């Protein structure tokens, strides 16, 4: 249902900044807690709204530099706060997990009344978006920004030590049915990846099938939590004619911060995503 955001609630957002157009807020009641989502609506709609699944430690304002630009270009979006990731989502579900986040996302996407054709997943949110897409037959486009993929067994583990242990096992990320989903997905996929994310782990002193982690390269600290093999496995799973990839130079896994710090890159990413969404081929 639509509801009015209070000053106290705004104070819990990561970024309280004015939207370039209309915004509406939706609240859903779950088992013992509530979560909110924000719908950005363009003045002139050129495409159905995206459903956006944010990354770890994100609320629905984290991707403002991208989502506001898309709103100006006629593409709206609905983004929900998911349990376990931000001050704005607290208290949230007890024992929050990817599976609980998926349930929350499923509830919120229903507010788009089946109009949504594109899912956008950021980092951890990409793992959830892939699971969500498998349940929504109308989805024909996926935008995956610095995507993470986790073993299926990790999806029910509560965030914390158990979840971390499950995802840090070498090669565990291959134990996921999202690759099989992509192999039969008839739609198109856009990957947006930082140049210094998905670094080769062996080249940086780590074991195969793991991430390179944080590395200092040419005097600059670079964060690469995504194993190189995850990106390769995703690209292998999507038929070549259906896959596009935008590589952001001088950028690591922190794409959300990079878009905020470098407006011209935010322009580039927004233009690429808008072109992808609006392309009817």
PLM segments and residue spans:
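The serine-hydrolase catalytic nucleophile loop
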Residues: 56-68, 203-204
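Gly/Ala-rich beta-loop-alpha elbow adjacent to hydrolase catalytic centers
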Residues: 120-129
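Catalytic histidine-centered segment of alpha/beta-hydrolase-like enzymes
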Residues: 251-263
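N-terminal cap/lid segment of alpha/beta-hydrolase-fold proteins
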Residues: 2-42
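Alpha/beta-hydrolase active-site loop
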Residues: 94-112
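Active-site glycine-rich loops that stabilize anionic/oxyanionic intermediates
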Residues: 47, 53-58
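Conserved alpha/beta-hydrolase
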Residues: 71-89
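Short beta-strand/loop motif that positions the catalytic acidic residue
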Residues: 185, 191-193
């Amino acid at each position: 249902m639509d509801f009015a955001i209070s000053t106290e609630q705004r104070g819990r957002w990561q970024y309280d900044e004015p939207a370039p157009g209309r915004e509406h807020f939706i609240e859903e009641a779950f088992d013992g807690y509530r979560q909110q989502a924000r719908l950005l609506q363009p003045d002139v709609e050129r495409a159905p709204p995206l459903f956006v699944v944010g990354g770890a430690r994100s609320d629905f304002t984290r991707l403002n530099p991208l989502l506001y630009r898309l709103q100006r270009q006629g593409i709206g979006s609905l983004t929900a706060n998911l349990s376990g990731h931000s001050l704005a989502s607290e208290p949230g579900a007890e024992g929050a997990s990817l599976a609980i986040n998926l349930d929350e996302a499923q509830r919120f996407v229903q507010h788009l009344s089946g109009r949504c054709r594109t899912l956008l997943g950021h980092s951890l949110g990409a793992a959830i978006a892939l699971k969500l897409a498998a349940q929504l037959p109308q989805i024909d486009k996926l935008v995956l920004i610095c995507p993470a993929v986790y073993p299926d067994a990790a999806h029910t583990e509560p965030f914390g030590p158990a979840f971390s242990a499950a995802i840090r096992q070498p090669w565990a990320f291959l134990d996921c049915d999202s690759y099989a989903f992509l192999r039969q997905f008839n739609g198109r996929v856009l990957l947006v990846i930082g140049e210094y994310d998905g670094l080769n782990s062996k080249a940086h002193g780590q074991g195969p099938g793991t991430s390179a982690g944080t590395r200092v390269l040419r005097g600059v600290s670079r964060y690469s939590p995504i194993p190189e093999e995850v990106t390769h496995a995703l690209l292998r799973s999507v038929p070549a004619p259906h896959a596009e990839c935008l590589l952001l130079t001088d950028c690591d896994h922190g794409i959300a911060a990079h878009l905020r710090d470098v407006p011209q890159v935010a322009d580039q990413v927004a233009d690429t995503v808008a072109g992808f969404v609006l392309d009817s081929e």
